[in-house]
Amino acid sequence: MPKGTDRLIIDAPAAIGVARFKTLLKMADAVLLPVLPSAFDRGATGRFISHIESVKPIRKNRKPLGVVANMVRPGTRAGRRLMAFLDDLDYPPVATLRARTLYPELAEDGLGLFDRGDKAAKILQTEWTPLVTFIETLGADLS
């Protein structure tokens, strides 16, 4: 890891196989699994979780699995279905991030959400607090 780096996120492809997952897991302290509110994502997520729950570090909770409900529109049927699905899997989300037009605008400008301090960004930053806390708490547990 580069000097001065406290946290490093490795973005893996959605269709990663169990063998490649195990390789990446050796380098990781935890797994973050973003899930979109769609039937396709729910199906893929259910299958993926059933496969990785047999991997020893996940099964023994030595490498925590944090599910992130991503691009959720509150009050929609799709959002409710996603939350019910995650509840049924016994993986409540560590964070729920809403779908907002600010994200593509930030990407267009080459910025991240925490690069801006305006009201719109601050509102969305609060949604990230549980996820940041999950990651930072994990880091404290590993020290």
Each model region followed by its residue ranges:
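Conserved catalytic-core segment of NTP-binding enzymes
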Residues: 13-99
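C-terminal lobe/tail of nucleotide-utilizing enzymes
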Residues: 65-143
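P-loop/Walker-type NTP enzyme "switch/lid" segment
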Residues: 1-10, 14-18, 26, 107-118
